[in-house]
Amino acid sequence: GLILGGSITQNNFLGTGNKVSIGLTRSEYQSRYNFGYVDPYWTTDGVSLGYNVFYRTTDYKDLDVDVASYAVDSLGAGVSVGYPISETSRLTFGLTAQQDKIKTGLYTVDEIFDFVNREGDSYLNFKASVGWSESTLNKGVLATRGHSQSVTLEATTPGSDLSFFKLDYRGQVFAPLTDTYTMRFHTELGYGDGYGSTEGLPFYENYYAGGFNSVRGFKDSTLGPRGTPSRGVGVTGNVGTIADSDNDPLPFGGNVLIQGGAEVLFPLPFVKDQRSLRTSVFWDVGNVFDSKCDQVKNTNGSASNTQCNDISLSNLASSVGVGVTWVTALGPLSFALAMPVKKPDNAETQIFQFSLGQTF
């Protein structure tokens, strides 16, 4: 699928030394707008203070994007404080207020209707977060040496309409093989759940897998559990399943994410200046899972989200391929040509993928 993204960053805004950023990402079904302001030296010992405002729209409601049908509008603002604990690592604490509005669509699955019936369709949540990050990368873009990793715990606080948490880890390592060839290993893990009166992770906070920055060779967000098609009365008066045109169960995401991979970075032949180019052969692997697949029931008592697999490495999707990233004045242009090696049932493949504004 086509993903367009761009950002403008000024590291010394009006000579103050503060950082201002404006970001925009658009795809067929999602738009994200973000404004950020960071004072990197709020105190003399390097404590930073940041603010951000964001607006996101995700609309699977009317589009044929092979994902369970719904739309969510999110508006929020946050503040964060960062503490350096060494030259390469820091702790970050944040607090965000976020308003979410859910809209159901023509092919909305039972799990979404069930959640909306329990919790309503509009939520104001206050999220507190704590994170640790470390980086020894030699470059911010198209790095070739070093490593980076981060761990973040985010949870809603008392006074929120919903009670849930998410724990995420990201890491990557660059290991030079020769002067021009580099091995890169990367992984991303995530787990979320509800607590208190909220049963499970809210569906719109689910993890998804497939596509760029995930498992290339598969359509965006189409790996993992499938939803339960709703039943209703058709134009003939008969009760039947409300499904899309091909009657396939639609991807619903999950509360567990496992993905990673390895790639060999090498120079593109016959190109003298390689500073703005990255070429690789890669192996991607990953999937999302529902840890409560056999526990959740719909309002009619039937099993919810029956189209899901046990959390197991044997149930991971995988692909191999080649990728190219070219950093231009408009932002990074990334291309991937991938072939699925292990394809889960109902997974949607996409051999060629293109992105503007993202790197892998």
For the regions a protein language model found, what residue spans apply to each?
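Gly/Ser/Thr-rich helix-start
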Residues: 16, 218, 287, 322-324
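C-terminal structured "cap/appendage" subdomains that terminate the fold
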Residues: 295-345, 352
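C-terminal outer-membrane beta-barrel translocator/porin domains of Gram-negative envelope proteins
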Residues: 1-2, 106-309, 346, 353-359
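A generic beta-sheet turn/junction motif
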Residues: 26-28, 178, 283, 326-330
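Gram-negative/organellar outer-membrane beta-barrel architecture
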Residues: 1-148, 164, 183, 213-217, ...
